[in-house]
């Protein structure tokens, strides 16, 4: 029976565009790098958080173009009750949802890190995948500039710990208030255009 089905329709021996397999030395290198990153995050006093791969589409922070489709940029699925869920686009939206859901039970400031796969329904290209691993670290609930300084120190220390020299990387700072001021000054009112500007300055 199986042989008959196999003759009728052969499986495609290719991964979908923008997705890759990893095996052997390449996978071992990735896992070793993740282990070093995690070790350094813990050294700085951050706690690990794990969230689902799926989030309610509205919580992803995208804008639905119409009632019948999920937004572009994410892999969305419609459930039987007509609600939408999406594979997480990054690890920031799940953090915001978690903090909102558990704000009475978490420490303040809340120092957490998360390392996991994210998915983007975008055109793939060289070095640009539709599934990749992201390492995210945040301090939530502190307006003290020392928190920003700690994040810069953490990033530099982690890159050094992973084997990079100081002249091999740059740390660039951004402030959403400045970007928001640019959007207001340019009088960009349409939500999708605002999102494009925000992405350009990431």
Task: State each model region's role.
Residues 2-202:
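Extended, charged alpha-beta segments that form solvent-exposed binding/catalytic grooves
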